[in-house]
Swiss-Prot record:
GO biological process: translation
Keywords, sorted A to Z: Ribonucleoprotein, Ribosomal protein
UniProt subunit comment: Part of the 50S ribosomal subunit.
Ranges in coiled-coil conformation: none
Xref: HAMAP family: Ribosomal_bL31_2
Name of the protein this chain belongs to: Large ribosomal subunit protein bL31B
Originating species: Clavibacter michiganensis subsp. michiganensis (strain NCPPB 382)
Length: 85
């Protein structure tokens, strides 16, 4: 097995910009920005725009779209498609 070919795998803090939530995990990404974590250690921080803390699917605040109008519009538009004239 080759040595020194894999990226550095280290603890990283991800910060959700939408909700302000932060969580510590391990990743190969790196950042020049750092943050002091609850355990007193300093870790690289990666800002993400959306995570499971703020995504509508995971928070239960999703909107259910009424697709009936879209289906009817599609059917009316392509009602005669494929028929010989």
């Amino acid at each position: 097995m080759k040595t020194d070919i894999h990226p550095k795998y280290a603890p990283v803090v991800f910060r959700d910009l939408a909700s302000g939530a932060t969580f510590l995990t391990r990743s190969t990404v790196s950042s020049s920005k750092t943050i002091e974590w609850e355990d007193g250690n300093t870790y690289a921080v990666i800002d993400v725009e959306i995570s499971s803390e703020s995504h509508p699917f995971y928070t239960g605040k999703q909107r259910i779209m009424d697709s009936a109008g879209r289906v009817e519009k599609f059917n009316s538009r392509y009602a005669g498609f494929g028929t010989k004239k």
